[in-house]
């Protein structure tokens, strides 16, 4: 049961993390990246609901989630209380580059956490859930790294970043 609580807590942190990324991209007017990260947050939330439902139906208990985790932020601290119009193109470029790098780190850390839980659990259902979560994080890392390569090849040219938004909007429209 403890491993399921740890999975649930990690998923909740994931929801908050991807929500922070969505907020950053929304603030910057990068609607495609916003929809992408909103989609990722909803995927994490769906997984959290699945784990909670599994615990209720299998163990007839409520899953204890620690909601006191600090809300992560991908916003540069000097942007708090400012308008997006105050950000220079160089600051926006740096924020996008930094956010993507942070997302890769986040997903790698999630994999490490899930692998650690996998070593501790004997439940085949929990192991199956963990394998799916690990695979999802690996896919996300691949997607982000491909995007980073594209952007790096253009020097993180903001015209190209804006050009990409339509394809991300199309991919993640609901």
Label every PLM stretch briefly:
Residues 1-174:
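Iron-associated oxidoreductase/ferritin-like identity signal
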């Amino acid at each position: 049961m403890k491993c399921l609580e740890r999975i649930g807590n990690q998923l909740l942190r994931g929801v908050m993390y991807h929500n922070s990324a969505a907020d950053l991209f929304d603030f910057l007017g990068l609607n495609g990246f916003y929809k992408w990260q909103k989609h990722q947050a909803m995927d994490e939330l769906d997984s959290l609901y699945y784990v909670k439902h599994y615990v209720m139906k299998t163990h007839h208990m409520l899953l204890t989630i620690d909601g006191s985790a600090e809300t992560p932020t991908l916003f540069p601290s000097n942007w708090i209380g400012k308008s997006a119009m105050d950000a220079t193109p160089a600051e926006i470029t740096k924020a996008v580059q930094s956010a993507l790098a942070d997302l890769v780190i986040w997903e790698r850390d999630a994999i490490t956490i899930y692998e650690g839980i996998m070593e501790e659990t004997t439940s085949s259902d929990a192991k199956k859930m963990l394998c799916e979560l690990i695979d999802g994080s690996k896919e996300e890392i691949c997607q982000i790294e491909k995007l980073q390569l594209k952007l790096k090849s253009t020097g993180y040219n903001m015209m190209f970043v804006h050009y990409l938004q339509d394809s991300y909007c199309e991919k993640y429209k609901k």
